Amino acid sequence: QSEPAGPPQPYTFSYDNTDEYGTRIAQEETGDENNNKVGSYSYTDPNGISRTVKYVADAEGFRVTVETNEPGTKTSNPADAQIVSNAATDSYSPSPASSPAKPPSLAVNAAPITIHAVHASPVVHAIHAAPVSYATAHHVTPVIALSHAPLTYTLGRAKSA
């Protein structure tokens, strides 16, 4: 494991971006020399539906509050996360991004259909088997196994009867 390089350094960063469709994404955070963090991040879609998360992380733990107007949400406090909802009580129906599709229209008139009679004719094709030959050269290196084994000699005379 590596040792920390030193005490936490204070920092601040943020960004706020809106794309060409109108979706906005933003975040900001500040950290201090005691490693405490305070920040938020948010998302807003082109229809105005938004969610903002505000958080604090310090010696007392991580605490978060979510502010939203997302349909189907209500103010609650699950898992010690405060959710504040400003959602309308009626149902949500987003505006259509484009008009409904229309059936395609024909640009040209169809050409008349011509029918030709097809007559079967015999196919004459001679099939001859081609000779198969394989020429391979195998170069085999002789293997000589040498091993040193003890030899036992018995010297003496055979006993006479």
Curated annotation (Swiss-Prot):
UniProt keyword RNA-binding, yes or no: no
Low complexity bias locations: 87-103
Pfam families reported in the protein's UniProt record: Chitin_bind_4
Keywords for this protein: Chitin-binding, Cuticle, Pyrrolidone carboxylic acid
Pyrrolidone carboxylic acid modified-residue sites: Q1
Keyword Nucleotide-binding in record: no
Residue stretches of biased makeup (Pro residues): 1-10
Biased composition range(s): Polar residues: 67-86
Domain of life: Eukaryota
GO cellular component, one term: chitin-based extracellular matrix
Alphabetized GO MF terms: chitin binding; structural constituent of chitin-based larval cuticle
Start and end residues of each Chitin-binding type R&R domain: 8-74
Signal peptide positions (record): none
Region described as Disordered: 1-44, 67-103
Protein name, as recorded: Cuticle protein 16.8
Organism: Ixodes ricinus (Common tick)
